[in-house]
Amino acid sequence: MADVVTMKQLLEAGVHFGHQTRRWNPKMAPYIFTQRNGIYIIDLQKTIKMLDDAYNFMKAVAEDGGVFLFVGTKKQAQDSIAEEATRAGQYYVNQRWLGGTLTNWTTIQSRVRRLKQLKEMSEDGTFDVLPKKEVALLTKEMDKLERFLGGIEDMPRIPDVLFVVDPKKEKIAVHEANILGIPVVAMVDTNTDPDPIDVVIPSNDDAIRAIRLIAGAMADAIIEGKQGQDDEETLEVDFKENADGSEEIVSAEENPED
């Protein structure tokens, strides 16, 4: 099987550039190739292998109908996280992570229901008959909920996997996933502790192109896995239909009409 991404793609996206040597986590030492001008250089041979592992893991979960949550709230990640999660038919948080998003899912669901209620009110004409001041307050509430919860508005349940850009910044999300036993796949830079991460992808987590490349690969894995699931379901339906047809033939042979 060919690698998910090529060495050339990783280099062009700047995936190999880590943080300054004075800002490092010693636990990332196994993934560092060298240092240059005070910057750690990530070992891209290891990145390629671990990215392949992450791809296969995401694909396998998708084949089983898994739900994925992409998390990246830093400015460089926001667009890629939203676009790639949406492309894969999954969910995202790209603004501030609300504490309890996973560990207090019931409360989050109530806020999502409120968001849907406000959207319905804005679309069915309710806002047209309310006082302007009240409409302004409701609109402000709706916009705030949309900003923080819009990416998980249709998420049917707690996700099976988190994909995270910069787990150091998203430590609350990672901690909640760890508490619930949800596997975390993450882009981990040289300044970050990899221990809370189940599937580490050693990578620059600050460059927009690097984030887009890795997030895109994860979305591709989900899409491929879902396609495999669809193919299996089609085969199962075909098999059942053929089996039903065979039973009818056997029944007809055993009970021929007089």
Swiss-Prot record:
An example of a GO molecular function for this protein is: structural constituent of ribosome
**Disordered: annotated span:** 226-258
Q: Which Gene3D superfamilies match?
A: Glucose-6-phosphate isomerase like protein, domain 1, Helix hairpin bin
Q: What residue spans carry the Acidic residues bias annotation?
A: 244-258
Write out the GO cellular component annotations. cytosolic small ribosomal subunit
Q: Name one GO biological process term.
A: translation
Keyword Ribonucleoprotein among UniProt keywords: yes
Listed InterPro entries: Ribosomal_uS2 (IPR001865), Ribosomal_uS2_bac/mit/plastid (IPR005706), Ribosomal_uS2_CS (IPR018130), Ribosomal_uS2_flav_dom_sf (IPR023591)
Cite the entry's keywords alphabetically: Ribonucleoprotein, Ribosomal protein
PROSITE patterns in the cross-refs: RIBOSOMAL_S2_1, RIBOSOMAL_S2_2
The family database entries (HAMAP family) matched by this protein are listed as: Ribosomal_uS2_B
Identify its protein family.
Belongs to the universal ribosomal protein uS2 family.
Query: What name does the UniProt record give this protein?
Result: Small ribosomal subunit protein uS2
**What species does this protein belong to?**
Lactobacillus acidophilus (strain ATCC 700396 / NCK56 / N2 / NCFM)
Instruction: Quote the gene name from the UniProt entry.
Output: rpsB
